[in-house]
Amino acid sequence: MAGLLSTFDTFSSRRSESINKSGGGAVIPGQRSTVSVFVLGPSVTDDADKLFIATTFLAHSLDTDKQHSQRGGFLVSLLAMAYSSPELYLTTNGVNADVKYVIYNIEKDPKRTKTDGFIVKTRDMEYERTTEWLFGPMVNKSPLFQGQRDAADPDTLLQIYGYPACLGAIIVQVWIVLVKAITSSAGLRKGFFNRLEAFRQDGTVKGALVFTGETVEGIGSVMRSQQSLVSLMVETLVTMNTARSDLTTLEKNIQIVGNYIRDAGLASFMNTIKYGVETKMAALTLSNLRPDINKLRSLIDTYLSKGPRAPFICILKDPVHGEFAPGNYPALWSYAMGVAVVQNKAMQQYVTGRTYLDMEMFLLGQAVAKDAESKISSALEDELGVTDTAKERLRHHLANLSGGDGAYHKPTGGGAIEVALDNADIDLEPEAHTDQDARGWGGDSGDRWARSTSSGHFITLHGAERLEEETNDEDVSDIERRIARRLAERRQEDATTHEDEGRNNGVDHDEEDDAAAAAGMGGI
């Protein structure tokens, strides 16, 4: 019987291994598109010329009249400018089954009077039409940088910041767009500027060189459509992480940005390991969790087999990345999320209300996480030399911390709080009140929020967070009563003022009450 159980335990991992292993059949190459990439030749030595070419690449990448593959090629050309040998960079990181990069050199000929003396060429021939297409007049539909209203002026930027800083600022921002385009495409602009703030504070990106919102959206649209560009950037990260130690400042900044996309799309998998397995609670011995534990073990083996590219399997669209979805191990994931919402308050905003959520296991996870005995790791008792007295005191403290809190967290997706209040200053400090304070407004939760004719005062998400930090449970209920009382008084004043009109100037009360209810004010 033991042998039979062992066979079942290893079936999942062996099955996954056999599916993903190469069968040794004939290799039939697929169709590949050709992408033109432009690199600087040895005759381009002036910093002003280099920065002009960089901003030209950026402008072409935003041209909506061009195909996305062409626009992606200009972004590749821009990224390659960070290296002394762009050809070697593309040879090392640009091997891709979807595209074939064709490299053209840009040279500077002082005798040329048109196209600013630039000429596009290869070893054998020159390309006049391509040169005119690349360096000819081009109308920018929007400024590239926030510090400019018209086309980029390389001389001005170069004089202020210098070439390495300008090029580094541009390339770092392209990498930040990659991060946000992959992880939160719906909020690309907001996410980009939030992530950029750290680089602005340390001086990596100067204010005049910050991308405009239109530039961010344009680059993001190209990255979402050109998987070959994303693959090139990921391979760049892998190379920097594994093959080199003498990184430039720009490359170190790229590594910092790249850390934000490590394990992107694998949050459920990582959280299941962290809260479901590594906590090592007794619930893991349940028989209905065993299939999911075996599945998770198989996924861990698959993840480790990917080597340095493992953190990027979702970004690279590796065929196995769908196996890591929590729907493939729902019971264990549900249990882990129950533990998580108790142990980590930030996880209470994590989206747990999914169709495959096992409610019983979700509640079980919360129950064992709240249990004082389960919080003590027996594996560390001997190693740390914990005495029986110390363990008893620890159990006592844990029981006191969790005592009286028998409520369970419901599955939720979280959300910001923004409550429209009347145009009045509300003092949030607790104050004494009497039963008479509550007279004049009903106890019904739907009636206790007064309807007003204006909403000029808001509690925003930032204010709500500050309120949560500065108040305790008793303060919250007191604040709720006082806000309701103030609004009730204002409602009574409005009713007196508009008695002859019979209505409050056409205000949609239902909509306002619904907004307050949606913001959760009734449950403070």
Curated annotation (Swiss-Prot):
The gene is N. Disulfide bonds: none annotated. Residues 487-508 have a biased composition (Basic and acidic residues). Belongs to the paramyxoviruses nucleocapsid family. It is found in: Virion; Host cytoplasm. Homomultimer; forms the nucleocapsid. Binds to the viral genomic RNA. N0 interacts with the phosphoprotein (via N-terminus); this interaction allows P to chaperon N0 to avoid N polymerization before encapsidation. Interacts as N-RNA template with the phosphoprotein (via C-terminus); this interaction positions the polymerase on the template. Residues 1-404 are annotated as: Ncore. The keyword Ribonucleoprotein applies. Residues 405-522 are annotated as: Ntail. Forms the helical nucleocapsid (NC) in a ratio of 1 N per 6 ribonucleotides, protecting the genome from nucleases. The encapsidated genomic RNA serves as template for transcription and replication; encapsidation by N is coupled to RNA synthesis. Forms the encapsidation complex with the phosphoprotein protein P. Before encapsidation, the newly synthesized free N protein, so-called N0, is chaperoned by P. This is Nucleoprotein. GO terms for cellular component: helical viral capsid; host cell cytoplasm; ribonucleoprotein complex; viral nucleocapsid. Residues 487-524 are annotated as: Disordered. RNA binds at K180, K190, R195, Y260, Y350, R354. Most abundant protein in the virion. Since the viral RNA genome consists of 15,383 bases,there are 2564 molecules per encapsidated genome. Ncore is globular and carries regions required for self-assembly and RNA-binding. Ntail is an intrinsically disordered monomeric domain in the C-terminus. GO terms for molecular function: RNA binding; structural molecule activity.
